[in-house]
Design a protein with these regions (language model features):
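Conserved two-metal-ion catalytic palm core of "right-hand" nucleic acid polymerases
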Residues: 1-467, 672-674, 678-740
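Generic preference for well-ordered alpha-helical elements
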Residues: 150, 356, 368, 372, ...
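Core residues of folded domains in eukaryotic genome-function proteins
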Residues: 274-278, 350-355, 462-464, 468, ...
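Active-site palm subdomain of RNA-directed nucleic acid polymerases
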Residues: 316-317, 321, 346, 383-384, ...
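Catalytic lobes of large eukaryotic enzymes
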Residues: 385, 519-521, 526, 530-533, ...
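Active-site and adjacent loop segments of nucleotide-processing enzymes
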Residues: 464, 525-533, 542-740
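Short, conserved phosphate/pyrophosphate- and ester-handling motifs at nucleotide-, phospho-/glycolipid
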Residues: 469, 473
């Protein structure tokens, strides 16, 4: 541990650093010869610290370098007060008439863009201005050594402000272009490695103790419910108003109940950590804020918590008659496969009607008394002890799937349902789990009834709802609304009607207009005994307008005219694609970009959108093109954030990378059709041209940076591939966006 103290002073000029070098002198300064001059300079330093910031630049470098008192007294709030113009966060939009993909544009225009009003977050440009002013005020120019080094620091600060929630910033990014020879205060050290180590530690201290301290002290940094991983910066006074308003609204509505200090202590042993009470925080949404409580395990033993989650999931599966569960892609694929098969058997010709609804405040609307009543009725009808077997799906490769399937066992430890479903076969992977329903019910009741949170000195008890942040919150919410559908919506889920549910999102599809009207009336009225009310702004239908036949649900676009599921490419209108990925790779950037591009592409082309039982040739081409659209948007982000900062981009390498991913798309499509025992009639050249064409489309997208060299290289490849396309298949290429 070492530090440097100027002669004649008692305050350390440098903070403490951990150093691996053997040198004992960090900064070697010339010793003043005149004692009177030293005393005068010392008094000048102290006067400048007392007065503030006006005379700080006139103080010699040797006496104010990282003065601790000076740094502690600095407060950049006055800079914020001088900023009159507030920049709102803007989303990239696609201008009308600029592209020929009308289908995709219509889906994008149906998405409401977030609009922040008076409580808008600050733009990163404003925060950047504040931080640069702080660095100019505190750090003398001699520390940077040159304007080049200061520009590198500003570039690093800008990069930090634009990082995603889960991204990391490496010190190597900052030190890569720093000219250590310009830092004359460190040139007395002869070893280059020692100089670099010292400069790196100084720059690291500036980042942690000045830049990050200013961010923590002047801004509230949080994520947004609809902005994915992007960080938003609020003024603390503005965010405090939002926080107080959201908290008072929950107290006035009866969701939270105030407690005294003495009464709250009795609940502390049931919280996330023994003797501690979790603190509530809010995440901004379009209209209000979402409460988050880090309840986690809630004081329950891990083994009991594991059994409770499995038990609740099994209870939710028993409520199948109310709705088709579509929480993941596999469940939605099975439900849509059965429904399309039923419609094809009836030879339907009428148009389909749909009603989509969303529960307003799904987690906060759960009634504790109703939840306990539902659980009690289920527990009373079960045996004191249950055995659940652990199984997994056997894949075509001979390996076992990582996802565990739990099946109820009888007294002879035999599964209560078949382990073979068509070509799917389940194999046992572990010993049975013994579950005691009554014990789990008591634990859940204690957990839900005794939820206590804190907000500063205010202590509150959750009187209604389950907090988002608990381990069992999602399972309790799923069971609650599955029971509601079984009690109130089972009459609609018959015949050619289908009610899909993904936790709190509902989609009703029917051939009958009267049935659709009945469901719409039910959603408007809500379900009072479950305290369930639908969000009218998110409720839409095509009862009065049959032209609308596409509806987004559970991450896909449901086309009711062609009965196909399309890739949800219109999600690009929600925000900048950069914040949908984690960019934490420091080494091998080319391989990292290739891996991310492949992951983005294949994640969109799941068996859900490629199932040959309901996917036609036009739908397959549309999904491949849409996956190319999504991959192209993220490729631009990867080029801008990963490859461009390291120097000139090899565009031929990037074009070859896109083509290689296109060949993997062909193999993915073939694999899905092979598992469905269906011959693929579309040649590989058509699929490859479609995917690469989608990527080329994003290279000329109006609202994104353009890469003409990559676009040119890909077009050359497309021209060579077009010659190989059979004449009877060329008709698919000009109509890529069409789905009917």
């Amino acid at each position: 541990m070492w530090h440097c103290t100027p002669r004649g002073t008692t305050e350390p000029s440098l903070p403490y650093f951990t150093s691996s070098c053997d040198t004992t002198l960090a900064l070697k300064q010339k010793r003043p010869t005149d004692g009177a001059n030293v005393a005068a300079k010392r008094r000048k330093v102290m006067e400048s610290c007392d007065k503030g910031y006006s005379e700080a630049q006139e103080v010699p470098f040797t006496h104010i370098l990282y003065n601790r008192k000076f740094c502690e007294r600095f407060a950049p709030n006055h800079i914020l007060n001088k900023i009159n113009k507030v920049m709102s966060y803007a989303y990239p939009e696609c201008e009308d008439g600029q592209t020929q993909e009308i289908l995709l544009q219509q889906e994008m225009q149906a998405i409401k863009s977030p609009a922040f009003e008076t409580t808008s977050p600050l733009g990163w440009q404003q925060v950047f201005t504040v931080l640069v002013a702080v660095l100019r005020r505190i750090i003398p120019n001699e520390v940077w050594g040159s304007s080049h080094n200061f520009c590198i620091m500003k570039r690093a600060v800008k990069k930090i402000l634009m990082l995603g929630r889960h991204d990391k910033f490496y010190l190597g990014f900052l030190m890569k272009n720093i000219k250590t020879k310009d830092c004359r205060w460190a040139t007395s050290l002869r070893s280059f490695s020692v100089i670099t180590n010292l400069v790196a530690k100084v720059y690291l201290w500036i980042m942690t103790q000045i830049v990050f301290a200013t961010l923590r002290g002047s801004f509230y940094i949080t994520e947004h419910a609809s902005c994915r991983n992007q960080l938003l910066y609020y003024r603390k006074c503005v965010w405090q108003k939002q926080h107080d308003y959201a908290l008072s609204a929950m107290v006035n509505s009866g969701s939270l109940e105030k407690l005294s200090q003495e009464k709250a202590v009795t609940y502390s042993h049931l919280t996330a950590k023994k003797g501690s009470i979790p603190r509530i925080r809010f995440i901004p949404k379009m209209q209000n804020a979402r409460p988050i409580v880090p309840l986690r395990k809630g004081g329950m033993p891990p083994s009991l918590l594991y059994q409770a989650r499995i038990f609740l999931n099994e209870l939710s599966k028993g409520c199948k008659k109310g709705s088709f569960k579509a929480k993941n892609a596999y469940e939605l694929q099975n439900a849509w496969h059965m429904y399309t098969k039923k419609l094809m058997a009836t030879k339907f010709t009428k148009p389909l009607y749909f009603v989509r609804a969303d529960v307003q405040d799904a987690y906060g609307s759960i009634l504790h008394s109703k939840l306990f009543e539902l659980l009690k009725n289920c527990v009373d009808n079960l045996a004191p002890k249950l055995m659940l077997g652990q199984y997994a799906l056997m894949l075509d490769t001979g390996k076992v799937s990582k996802k565990t399937v739990y099946i109820l066992l009888d007294d002879k430890r035999q599964p209560t349902r078949s382990l073979v479903n068509g070509e799917e076969r389940l194999v046992e992977i572990g010993s049975p789990i013994i579950v005691q329903p009554q014990k789990i019910f008591n634990a859940i009741k204690n957990l839900v009834s005794n939820q206590v949170i804190t907000n500063g000195s205010l202590l509150l008890r959750v009187a209604r709802g389950v907090p988002q942040g608990g381990t069992l919150s999602a399972a309790l919410c799923e069971f609650y609304y599955a029971s509601m559908c079984a009690n109130h919506f089972s009459k609609y889920n018959i015949g050619t009607n289908m009610l899909l549910r993904a936790v709190d999102d509902f989609l009703f599809i029917s051939q009958s207009r009267d049935e659709a009207k009945r469901v719409l009336e039910q959603t408007v009225c809500g379900v009072p005994d479950f305290n369930c009310h639908m969000n009218r702004e998110k409720t839409f239908h095509n009862i009065d307008n049959q032209i609308v036949f596409r509806v987004p649900f559970c991450g896909v676009i449901v086309c009711l005219k062609s009965l196909q599921l399309l890739v949800h490419a219109s999600g690009l209108a929600n925000g900048y694609p950069r914040y949908s990925m984690r960019l934490n790779k420091f080494k091998a950037p080319g391989d990292f970009v290739k891996l991310r591009l492949q992951q983005v592409t294949l994640a969109r082309l799941k068996p859900l959108v490629l199932d040959p039982s309901y996917t036609k040739c036009s739908g397959l081409i549309a999904n491949v093109w849409r996956s190319g659209i999504m991959a192209g948007a993220r490729l631009i982000t990867l080029l801008h954030c990963v490859l461009s900062p390291r120097g000139p981009v090899n565009t031929k390498f990037v074009a070859c990378m896109v083509i290689k991913v296109g060949y993997k798309v062909c193999r993915q499509v073939k694999s899905v059709f092979k598992r469905g025992n269906v011959n693929l009639t579309i040649p590989d050249e058509v699929i490859l041209i479609t995917y690469v064409g989608g990527v080329c489309t994003m290279m000329k997208w109006p609202s994104l940076p353009k890469w003409p060299s990559i676009h040119t290289n890909l077009k050359k490849f497309l021209k060579r591939m077009l010659v190989r396309v059979p004449s009877n298949m060329q008709m698919l290429l000009p109509t890529i966006p069409q789905t009917t």
